[in-house]
């Protein structure tokens, strides 16, 4: 009897993180999917305050977070509780079976000093060449970020700014921080700032060190729930080569002109659920990536991705595939999502050396208003227009071509877009696409589809203002 009681206590000491029932999202799907496994977190609790943390907005908490994670790790895992306050920090590296829990009014602010965001190479003893994502995990199992608090990426200390994307007042405010202008004087770089040191020898080299806010690599059983993510230096969250990922009920917000300010990017992951999120981003809203070229093929596809009940306000695209997806896209369901004020709604973008093949993509019941450009767009010559980029003029080897196929859209409702459907590509790049039972109200043109693009429209109604 005693042994049975001990066994029961051990079982109950592990709690499935915020054990919400997600089964309703897996009913009546057009493809078979496995519901992601939630992380199992031991019922141990450590407060950041117990480990020297201080939420006064002045104290650096990097060591306190590391100490708390180490303490929980020795206990087999548990919940790292962050109470109300402002916690300045550098890197937070999660370990197995740990939940980073932000209580209401808890704000984690990433340090303005870029040096706080680099790991030291254990072999050379020198700083790594690129900053590490502020909250990171690699090859971990059962990890989560939960709660009602906020993570502020302090992105303006990292991101370059294009003059064309800010007002006169904003431009003066950036220059008041110090910084450096490019030769043309139309791009501001956060290099040679008044109050923070450089981390590279010039502005271009420093720009290459910029990285994401949250990145999980090769992890299993991941949950991000409830928190608010603000103003990342680059992408806000990007699980990469992960399995069993749930992103539920988070808010992502950054300036509309934030360079590379993607909200949620999923890269070569399997069994993913993205639900109930609210996004207002500087770049893509919910984006699927699968690597470029041979590296993308090795990483594998995005597979079994379920995206429902999300709202996207500003973004370059509400739902996006690409630009790099050489590993492929397989079994993706996007339904019951709203896009209001995005540049494009459903965006499929890629190019030579970045492309792959899509399979079993189903998009249903999408509601869009005030779309700046095309409601639905296919681009196969996409140019990654990062700051200072120049289009390549030399011939490119014709490999890893985009193959957008087997994409099925239905019940797409659009009130306000410049172009309804736009598709450009050579023969074989955009084909076997169906759009059914949809209404599109446009202001410029209903369709702009190349003859080589094979898109079947069934019961699609286009309307515009009377002329």
PLM feature spans:
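Extracellular "leader-to-stem" segments immediately downstream of a signal peptide or signal-anchor
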Residues: 1-81, 86-99, 103-218, 223-225, ...
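Short, small-residue-enriched loops and turns at beta-alpha junctions
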Residues: 54-56, 293-297, 327-328, 354
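Extracellular beta-rich repeat passengers
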Residues: 325, 336, 345-467
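Short glycine/acidic-rich loop motifs that flank beta-strands on beta-rich extracellular proteins
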Residues: 77, 91, 111-112, 154-158, ...
């Amino acid at each position: 009897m005693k042994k049975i009681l001990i066994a029961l206590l051990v079982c109950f000491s592990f709690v499935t993180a915020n054990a919400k029932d997600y089964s309703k999202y897996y009913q009546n799907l057009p493809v078979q999917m496995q519901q992601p496994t939630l992380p199992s977190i031991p019922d141990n609790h450590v407060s950041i305050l117990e480990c020297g943390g201080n939420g006064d907005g002045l104290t650096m908490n990097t060591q306190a977070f590391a100490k708390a994670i180490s303490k929980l790790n020795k206990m087999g895992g548990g919940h790292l509780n962050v109470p109300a306050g402002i916690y300045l920090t550098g890197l937070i590296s999660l370990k197995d079976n740990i939940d980073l829990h932000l209580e209401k009014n808890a704000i984690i602010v990433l340090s303005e000093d870029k040096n706080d965001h680099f790991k030291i190479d254990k072999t050379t003893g020198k700083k790594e060449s690129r900053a590490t994502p502020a909250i990171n995990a690699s090859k971990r199992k059962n990890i989560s970020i939960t709660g009602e608090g906020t993570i502020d990426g302090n992105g303006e200390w990292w991101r370059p700014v294009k003059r064309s994307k800010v007002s006169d007042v904003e431009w003066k405010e950036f220059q008041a921080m110090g910084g450096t202008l490019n030769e043309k004087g139309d791009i501001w770089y956060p290099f040679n700032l008044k109050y923070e040191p450089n981390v590279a020898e010039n502005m271009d080299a420093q720009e290459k060190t910029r990285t994401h806010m949250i990145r999980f690599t090769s992890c299993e059983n991941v949950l991000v729930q409830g928190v608010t993510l603000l103003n990342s230096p680059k992408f806000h969250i990007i699980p990469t080569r992960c399995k069993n990922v749930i992103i539920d009920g988070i808010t992502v917000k950054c300036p509309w002109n934030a360079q590379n300010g993607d909200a949620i990017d999923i890269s070569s992951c399997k069994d993913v659920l993205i639900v109930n999120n609210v996004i207002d981003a500087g770049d893509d809203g919910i984006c699927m990536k699968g690597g470029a070229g041979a590296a993308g093929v090795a990483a594998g596809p995005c597979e079994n991705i379920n995206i429902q009940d999300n709202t996207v306000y500003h973004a370059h695209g509400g739902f996006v595939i690409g630009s790099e997806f050489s590993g492929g896209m397989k079994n993706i369901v996007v339904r019951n999502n709203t896009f209001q004020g995005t540049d494009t709604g459903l965006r499929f973008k890629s190019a030579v050396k970045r492309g792959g093949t899509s399979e079993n993509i189903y998009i249903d019941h999408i509601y869009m208003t005030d779309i700046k450009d095309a409601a639905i767009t296919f681009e196969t010559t996409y140019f990654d227009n990062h700051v200072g980029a120049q289009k390549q003029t030399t011939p490119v080897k014709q490999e890893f071509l985009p193959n957008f196929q087997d994409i099925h859209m239905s019940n797409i409702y659009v009130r306000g877009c410049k172009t309804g459907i736009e598709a450009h590509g050579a023969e074989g790049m955009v084909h076997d696409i169906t759009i059914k039972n949809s209404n599109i109200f446009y202001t410029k043109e209903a369709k702009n589809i190349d003859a080589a693009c094979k898109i079947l429209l069934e019961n699609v109604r286009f309307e515009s203002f009377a002329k």
